[in-house]
Amino acid sequence: MRVLKFLSLMAMLGCTIGQSGSATPGSLHLLGGPTTTDWYPECALRCWENTKYVTKCSEDQQCLCSDVNYQNSVFQCIYSQCDTVHFGSALHHAIAQCLGTDNEVFFAIPPIPDRDALRRREDEYAAGAKLFGSGSAAGYPTESAAFPVQSANYPTDSVGGPYSPSPTASVPFPYFSLTSVTSPAAKSATTTEATRNTVPASTTAPSPSPQLYTGNASTSRATVSLTVVLTVAAVYLVL
């Protein structure tokens, strides 16, 4: 009975290993030789295979391991495509590809991406995070908010009545004759001077007009008043 239980247990274990290794498609692949068996994530295989198209080495393992640009591209792909759980396994797979060659230039720590575009993008992102993290006292939001403030001046000018382009909008447009040579300003100045000259002309000319405002005017008024009083008294006596 013990032998039968042991055989059945081994059969179940073999079925489980076979199903996990071949039937179930996952993010891990089984790679190994006659004595060792290792699991590697799909991102490691994808980065190693797809990056070959950017080089001239094709399938030459010796050429791939000696190409520094290819190795940097593989590391950048692993750094961006593999998550934290699979990053160590993907890095181990990349290092293991060149263990049998004379050009073992892979290291345990991946280098920082040396491309200017990636470094510039990281710097801009860090600067933007600091800018917007410290508040909106300066930077792009404050600069863009200036446009509504400037445009608010236009409705303010027309508050309190209809739109008026200038303070002198109610004054009619001056008439310019075709035969006129001088400007309207010169004409108005000439008219004003003639008006001002009438006062001294009337005061300096010899005229008996000041005598009209003497006692003669009061005498005539008194005579008229006396006549009216006598007429009223006569009518009253008759009645």
From Swiss-Prot:
This entry's comment on induction and repression of expression is: Induced during infection of poplar leaves, with highest expression observed four days post inoculation.
Name of a matching Pfam family: CFEM
Kindly list the positions annotated as binding heme: D60
Q: Which part of the chain is the CFEM domain?
A: 19-125
Q: Which UniProt keywords apply?
A: Cell membrane, Disulfide bond, Glycoprotein, GPI-anchor, Heme, Host cell membrane, Host membrane, Host nucleus, Iron, Lipoprotein, Membrane, Metal-binding, Secreted, Signal, Virulence
The pro-peptide lies at 216-239
Q: Which GO terms describe its biological process?
A: biological process involved in interaction with host
Glycans attached where?
N216
Lipid modification (GPI-anchor amidated glycine) maps to G215
Composition bias type Polar residues, residue spans: 187-199
Give the start-end ranges of region Disordered.
187-216
Instruction: Tell me where on the tree of life, at the top rank, the source sits.
Output: Eukaryota
Q: What is this protein called?
A: Secreted effector CFEM9
Query: Whose protein is this, by species?
Result: Marssonina brunnea f. sp. multigermtubi (strain MB_m1) (Marssonina leaf spot fungus)
